[in-house]
Regions:
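N-terminal low-structure segments adjacent to metalloprotease catalytic domains
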Residues: 1-58
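Pan-zinc metallopeptidase signature
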Residues: 12-17, 21-35, 194-222
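Extracytoplasmic/secreted envelope proteins and their assembly/folding machinery
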Residues: 57-64, 140, 166, 170, ...
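Auxiliary, metal-adjacent structural segments of Zn-dependent hydrolase domains
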Residues: 58-117, 132
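Surface-exposed patches in mature extracellular/periplasmic domains of secreted proteins
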Residues: 67-83, 154-160, 182-186, 216-221
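Short pre-active-site segment immediately N-terminal to the catalytic Zn-binding motif
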Residues: 118-139, 154-160
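Active-site recognition of the HExxH zinc-binding catalytic motif
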Residues: 137-150, 169-170
């Protein structure tokens, strides 16, 4: 019995230690030793492929131009842009959100992207419908999540209804992953497809901002 108790304690410690390691990695992507790194002012880019500084600079400039349309934007925001090939590093980092095009973990400064192409300014999760966005627009989208969280608090941001939580970042990005001609097809195939939350949310946010005189503070109230 004593040996069994020791084994259980050892197993629990290993499981706890493994959970701590995983939690650390998903919040600190640099722990996965990305082979390429480049700094652009207060933005650090980690990548699985060589980084074309000129092309990446254009992508970031477009993203920041989109962000500048939001009253929440501030220059010099520290962030980490993590570009993957959709392989094992993505699988490790994206636990719980593996089908996403990109994501930001709460309380984290890292923005993590699925299969990315800097040269073409594209990022995809491989879905045949609603699976492609501009990389620059998606950087703007994920950075907006950070701006909202900084403005109203992480927990308040998480409690926002989905149409506000995802709709405002898409409004700032000026895009969703659904082409207008694909909306009807997606609704026929799956009326509850998560991608529709973004599409509908952006339209609702645009309508609400038009109604309230453009007040983002009013929009972000619960």
């Amino acid at each position: 019995m004593a040996r069994l108790a020791r084994l259980r304690r050892w197993t629990a410690r290993v499981a706890c230690g493994g959970a701590v390691v995983i939690a650390g990695v998903v919040h600190v992507p640099a722990a996965l030793a990305f082979p390429y790194r480049a700094d652009f002012g207060s933005t650090t880019v980690l990548s699985e492929q060589p980084i074309d500084r000129a092309a990446m600079g254009r992508v970031l400039a477009r993203a920041d131009g989109l962000l500048a349309t939001s009253p929440l934007y501030r220059t010099g925001l520290s962030r980490q842009v993590v570009l993957t090939d959709g392989g094992w590093r993505w699988d490790v980092l994206s636990i719980g959100v593996r089908n996403a095009i990109a994501f930001r973990r709460p309380f984290a400064h890292a923005l993590v992207f699925n299969r990315s192409s800097v040269a073409t300014d594209r990022v995809t999760n491989g879905a045949p419908l609603g699976g492609v966005r501009t990389l620059s627009g998606t950087i703007a989208h994920e950075t907006t999540h950070r701006l909202v969280a900084d403005h109203i608090g992480e927990w308040a941001a998480l409690r926002l209804p989905a149409w506000k939580r995802e709709g405002y970042p898409d409004y700032v990005a000026g895009e969703t992953s659904i082409r207008p001609g694909d909306e009807a097809l997606i609704r026929r195939l799956d009326p509850t497809a998560p991608v529709l939350t973004y599409y509908e949310g952006r339209r609702r946010v645009a309508a609400e901002l038009a109604r309230n005189g453009g007040s983002v503070d009013a929009l972000l109230k619960d």
